[in-house]
Amino acid sequence: MGEIMRKESEKPVISVIMPAYQAAQYIGQAIESVQSQTCGQAWELLVIDDCSTDGTMEAVRRYASDPRIHYIRQRKNRGVAAARNLGIKKAQGAYLAFLDADDWWDADKLRLQMEWIKRTGAVLCCTGRELMQPDGTPQGRVIGVPQSITYRMLLRTNVIPCGSVLLRADAAREFGFVCDRYHEDYILWLRILKKYGAAVGVNVPALKCRQSAGGKSRNKWKSAVMQYGSYRYLGYGRLRALYYMMFYTLHGVWKYFGASGGRQK
């Protein structure tokens, strides 16, 4: 496992974990959105390169002068769950955030979330998201989040985008991400909410989510199979899993036709 740009700096309060694979084209925008945060808290960014071959390392090197940015390269491709788990292991912050290398944040994202976590005592906080075209232009679709998200609510469908999350590091370490055969982030959120109580949602589209045709969340059949597998992994029987799949399907229809901006393109 290769590691570069690991420098001493102020101990961070927030560790941002950014898995990256073949991300040279977009990762600069993602990194700069972390650098632009107005939260007033010390942070570190851990870029976990999952054995890219497209120049991702060189793209990250452009930010080598920032001691808060750390680059770790895996020797073989192990998938996004393993990359995030490595980031969790290396993180020094009391709070963790996740950001994919092709997405980006509004500048106030972490500030708003820290305010809500301090106000409510929640272990996990998420935000809404705005869907973007591959070239970074808006699709005209914003997907919000409820102010409070309980375990039972989340069982019906995943309303917590991974790139919008800020959570306590100890809770993430307690469970970690499971393998990529399932919705690994969804399983983690459910485990955390079951033990620690409801998540808090900040209904602001602070996550800008770049949509690609080959993305896991865009392949509806594959996503549905993974959703069912997630229920089974959590110990639910076939009938109970199918019961929750009904809500998952209905929510998918609502997202397709009912979210801000109309039908998905």
Language-model region placement:
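Short aromatic/hydrophobic "clamp" motif used to bind/position activated sugar donors
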Residues: 96
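A conserved acidic beta->alpha catalytic loop
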Residues: 33, 49-58, 76, 100
